[in-house]
Amino acid sequence: MNKKKLKAHFFVLYIICSCFILILSIKHDKYNNESKKKKKFFKIRTKIIFYKLKKVNQIKNAPQLYIQFYKPKCHKTTQSLKDIFNELSGNKNPENPKNIDEYNLTPKLKKTVELFQSMPNSPYYKSQQVILMGKKISSMPDKHKIRQNQVLGCQSVVYIYPKVEENEDKKKVIVWLGHSDGLLTKGIVYILTDGLSGYMPEDILKVNPNFITLTGISEFLTMSRINGYLNIMNKIKIFCTNILKNMDN
């Protein structure tokens, strides 16, 4: 093979190698650009504030962002949530809705409301506080987890059981046991069972369930959870009514 043919072969090989390297570099740059776009999109998406409840279900990969970033658009939205809650509960707000004393709360429930009112007006912090409270709930024996004690119409599985005891004044009071398999729902169950334990059934029946609007919790609850809360309160009041009837007999 003479020198001219050898040079020609080397030249062709050089061109092939150059083209191969060029193709690899183009693909590498394209991959980097796509990865940068994905990272940029992810950063932008994590900063989105979800104003409408329906938008939560549209984002499958970010279910926690709703609790962290959801805030009502304006005062009218917050007010409409309270109106919906009042309509569902069947209870009217007092003449002065901001007056905590008009909701006939037990001392324990009053302290809980004051705790949430002292917190920053942030759905994220308040939802985390509800979840932390749920961890304090006492375990319910399996023998009480029966159909009779189950709260129907809740998104999570919820059980409520009343224990009638005598206090120091020889009066009949109720100690509540509760259970739920949901994080937020378990916190709500704890707030109610702890706040209503140790009181007479007639005092519990006077409690206006709309007190939850004072805490700010109802502003980040979905409609299904609001219904669940009201069903829990309704179950508690049914138990109290039946206990009072048995006491009279």
UniProtKB/Swiss-Prot annotation:
Pathway the protein takes part in: Cofactor biosynthesis; iron-sulfur cluster biosynthesis
Compartment list: Plastid, Apicoplast
Description of the deletion phenotype: Parasites require mevalonate for survival. No significant effects on apicoplast morphology.
InterPro entries on file: Fe-S_metab-assoc_dom
Gene name linked to the record: SufE
Entry keyword annotation includes Isomerase: no
Pfam families: SufE (PF02657)
Subunit structure: Monomer. Interacts with SufS; interaction enhances cysteine desulfurase activity of SufS.
Residues spanning the membrane: none
PROSITE patterns: PROKAR_LIPOPROTEIN
Natural source organism: Plasmodium falciparum (isolate 3D7)
Alphabetical list of Gene3D superfamilies matching this protein: 3.90.1010.10
UniProt PTM comment: Proteolytically cleaved.
Keyword tags: Apicoplast, Plastid
Gene Ontology cellular component list: apicoplast
Family, as annotated: Belongs to the SufE family.
Functional note: Participates in sulfur mobilization (SUF) pathway for iron-sulfur (Fe-S) cluster biogenesis. Enhances cysteine desulfurase activity of SufS. Probably functions as a sulfur acceptor for SufS.
Protein name: Cysteine desulfuration protein SufE
Coiled coil region boundaries: none
Catalytic residues (positions): 154
Organism taxonomic ancestry: Eukaryota, Sar, Alveolata, Apicomplexa, Aconoidasida
